[in-house]
Amino acid sequence: MNTHWFITLIALCCPAMTLAAPNETAVVAPVDAISFLKQHDAKVQAILAEATADTLPPALRENIKGHINAAFDFPELSRLALGTHWQERTPEDRDHFIQTFSGIIEEQNFDSFVQYYREGKITYESAERDGDATVVVAKVPLQREEIEIVYKLHQVQKAWRVYDLVIDGVSTAEGNRRRYARYIEKKGYEKLIAQLDKQLARLRPTRN
């Protein structure tokens, strides 16, 4: 398993229609975030164990997608990806971007996620609070090397959600923000979302 998909994935979650805000209730211990990640991994692996062949039947595939998606806060990831341009968008624009952005990540990275859950051996090493977020450091052995993954999580409606992944020091949220900012500066937001819509349309027929 190579590391390329780790760098490009942000993660998968159900396309949300509104921007979810971090939970404002009681403080939760950082160690609970590790428990959440471990339980999430175990659930997906249990579903994968039901497969009798390498090719997943459609119903099982959708079940796995749902569980993988549930770990991530795509509205927040979308906000971070657009950076300052997020405030310039209407609520309808934001909803559109969330749906398209999440769909692209889901379609591009599903097979790599499945490979990871089948073969990956991740060790969650530590968790600590960083402002309103909780940062979990993990290590994944890949062939002869080991990569570090830093999960950034917060509470959304009393549930842990991942909103950024830092892979060997590279933040996926920051990478997307820089890339989209350059595109918007050159061609404008409307051309960006049109290009993303086309990309998603190309991806979906190959997956369904």
Residue ranges and their predicted role:
Residues 1-7:
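Bacterial N-terminal signal peptides that target proteins for export
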Residues 13-16, 21:
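N-terminal signal peptide c-region/cleavage motif recognized by signal peptidases
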Residues 26-109:
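Early exported N-terminus immediately downstream of N-terminal targeting peptides
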Residues 28-31, 35, 46, 50-53, ...:
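Surface-exposed, polar/charged faces of alpha-helical domains
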Residues 86, 103-104, 143, 169-172:
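Solvent-exposed loop/turn segments at secondary-structure junctions
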Residues 107-147, 199-208:
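Surface-exposed, charged secondary-structure patches
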Residues 146-174:
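Short beta-strand edge/turn micro-motifs at domain boundaries
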Residues 167-208:
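Low-complexity, intrinsically disordered terminal/linker segments enriched in charged
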